């Protein structure tokens, strides 16, 4: 499996959080695609 995206710190900017959430969504899509 690809590595899970690391959560930005609590002091991260909104842009960092947006990138993190996009990476998590992509990560979940990769895993569910492999599973089914």
From Swiss-Prot:
InterPro entries assigned: Pancreatic_hormone-like, Pancreatic_hormone-like_CS
Domain of life of the source: Eukaryota
UniProt-listed PROSITE patterns: PANCREATIC_HORMONE_1, PANCREATIC_HORMONE_2
GO annotation terms (biological process): feeding behavior; neuropeptide signaling pathway
Tyrosine amide: residues bearing it: 36
Gene Ontology cellular component annotations, sorted alphabetically: extracellular space
Gene3D superfamilies: 6.10.250.900
Subcellular location: Secreted
Keywords on record: Amidation, Hormone, Secreted
One function term, GO molecular function aspect: neuropeptide Y receptor binding
Family as reported in the entry's similarity comment: Belongs to the NPY family.
Family matches, as PANTHER family: NEUROPEPTIDE Y/PANCREATIC HORMONE/PEPTIDE YY (PTHR10533), PEPTIDE YY-RELATED (PTHR10533:SF14)
Protein name: Peptide YY-like
The organism of origin for this protein: Oreochromis niloticus
């Amino acid at each position: 499996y690809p590595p899970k995206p690391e959560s930005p710190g609590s002091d991260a900017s909104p842009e960092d959080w947006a990138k993190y959430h996009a990476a998590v969504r992509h990560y979940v899509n990769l895993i569910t695609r492999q599973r089914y």
